[in-house]
Amino acid sequence: MTIWIDADACPVPVREMVLRAGQRTATALVFVANSPLPVPRRALVKTVQVAQGFDVADNYISQHAVINDLVITQDIPLAAEIVEKGITALNPRGELYTEANIRQRLAMRNLSEELRSMGQISGGPNKFGDKEKQNFANALDRWLQKAKKTT
């Protein structure tokens, strides 16, 4: 059981929570990014720096994550690949990607991207605040408890 973190766009508070939870539960963590990450050296914590390029980190995670792992990502196309493989995917706001919601999220992402390119909308996601941190912490704890029961 490993937690894979799509670390380039992962908020620092989420990375910190994952590090604490991984240490507390002796869970392997792999932070994947295309730039160096300030991640402390600890047992069961690995950083993988992939080459620069579009979706290189995503492809690495998709190729290496397996059933019973958790992937933390904001990247909806990566989440769709992960869910299709039967692997659990969670975003930094604490929302699980599932077979029931991933198609809708992908469609909304594509629509937003299209509207942004046409100048119809601007901006990005809402502020990442205390509520989002708490939602993520709760979702991560639920997954860890469930995962520990099945191993």
From Swiss-Prot:
It holds the Pfam family DUF188. InterPro entries: UPF0178 (IPR003791). HAMAP family: UPF0178. Belongs to the UPF0178 family. This is UPF0178 protein Ping_0754. It comes from Psychromonas ingrahamii (strain DSM 17664 / CCUG 51855 / 37).
